[in-house]
Each structure stands twice: as C-alpha cells, then as structure tokens.
Amino acid sequence: MRAVGGVASDDQGNATVLGAFAIAALAAVLIMVIYVGAAVLARHRAQAAADLSALAAAADHVAGESDPCAAARTLAATQRPPAEVVSCRIDGEDVLVSVRVPVDLGRFGMRSAGASARAGPVG
C-alpha cells in the first residue's frame, strides 16, 4: 500500500470488522426475539389455564359444589407448565379466576405471566 502524507492507507480487514459487528447485532436481535416469543407463549398458556380453570370452577359452582375454586386449582396445576391460581372468587353465578405461569427469561430471570378469566352460565 502507498502512504498518503506519511500515513498508511491500508483498508484490508475493514469489512471483516464490519461483518463481525453485523453478525453480533443480528445475534442480539435474534436472542431478544426468542425471549419476547417465550414471554408471549407464557402469556397465551396462562390465558388458556385461566379459561379452563374458570370453566371448571363455574361448572362445579352451577352443580352446587361447596368449593368450586378447588376444581380451578386442580385443573391449573395439571397444565404444562403448571399454573398457579392467584385468586378465585364467586360473583353471583359467575366465577372469576386469575392465574400465573412461570416463564424463564434466561439472564433476565424467572418471571411470571398472568391472566384472568370469567365463566358462568349464559343468559
């Protein structure tokens, strides 16, 4: 290479460094997409567990069971991953259930996704 004004003008390796930074940025974006996807999946699982638990509790409540929330807790615990019933209350003929599902976000730690559902007779 020729020197311009006494300074070497060597550009070899410049694209390698730029390529390495581009790959690192792409990897970081991909990792964030995976974590966001895990959080969204946990939220959907929590909603499914809340819906099913509320339906089970409402069916027991309409049938005259003494503790319809026990059915909600039992059903939530059988989900994959197991959901925890945070609250279960009777509101007239309806049952309101809130659950949470754990989600592992790697370096961001363990978090939980929550959801609520209401179920009861129609009409």
Where are these predicted regions, by residue range?
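Low-complexity, S/T/G/P-rich flexible repeat/linker segments used as non-globular hinges
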Residues: 3, 105-123
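Alpha-helical assembly-interface signal, strongest on the long, hydrophobic N-terminal helix that forms
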Residues: 1-69
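Short amphipathic secondary-structure patches
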Residues: 54-103, 118
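Short, structured secondary-structure boundary patches
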Residues: 32, 96-111
